[in-house]
Amino acid sequence: MKTIVRACSVLFASLFIFATAQGQDSDYEIPRTVDGHPDLQGVWENNTITPVERPDVFGDKEFLTDEDIDFLRAGLNTIESSGEDALFGEGVIQAIFEGEINSYDPSTGNYDSQWMAPRTIHRRTSQIIDPPNGKFPPRTEEAIAAGRDLAEHRRLHPADTWEDRPLGERCLSFGAPRLSAGYNSYWQIVQSKNTVAIIQEMAHDVRIIPLVEKPHVDESVKLWHGDSRGWWEGDTLVVETTNYSEASSTSPRTVEKVNIERLTRIGNSALQYRFTSNDPGNYSAPYTREIVFDKTPDKIYEYACHEGNYGMEYILSGHRAEERLAAEGGAND
């Protein structure tokens, strides 16, 4: 079975790994809806191996050379045919540079490589294009302190109640937009004249974005995924999202965050996605990421977390058992 899996992985790698040019082909004619707007509809995959921040090995290099791509392709082929743990997000490029695959969960095991979506190589050395060094701006002192406080709280109170566990573990929300690659990282876009819907594969979170002149909801209304409004700037769909709830993030002053997304079709199979976040409670300056989403004929299937919420029941009951053992140990001292 493993031999078949390895052979299939190599085949998928050879079929799907390619380098996408940056920018739109001057001869490309964007398909349009009956309303005359660019047609962004369909299922788009974010399976890039491009890291969010630029690895130090690339220095100030913004784009990969052909030699860089050959190196990454060889490493990716080795990983996908290894039969070892599946690597999601930035695990692939880390393994290529480190020369070894580190298990995501060495205690209980993990998906193996047959579960990996075929990953894609794009030209950029980082998703962050601003700041120009390809790195996040410095964190605020407020955010650093909040992170320390949260880590200490979770150490002392890992499961006093279900609210001590993060939203994703509770299968409530994984954030929007969710930009992690290679695992439940498909989006489906549906358009009408006055609305765009973006469906995320992860948790099937859906954003319904009005395209008409309509003010944001009152500032007293806060939402996990914020309140989005969209408009067209030429052939680019622009989406502004405000009114984030404090519960949607562990960072301070989340309510002040404003995100701007820009979606531009740059080829029959390529959608350029730019994301600018102004998050003053978390970062000292705004930053911008760029990702190329690739068109796929695949469908988005049902998303399942832990049905019946049995995972949370076991987490909480397990912690109660640990508390009883600790109490019994103290009584015997």
Residue ranges and their predicted role:
Residues M1-A7:
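Positively charged n-region of N-terminal signal peptides that target proteins for export
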Residues C8-F18:
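Bacterial N-terminal signal peptides
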Residues Q22-D333:
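PEST-like low-complexity, intrinsically disordered acidic/proline/serine-rich tracts
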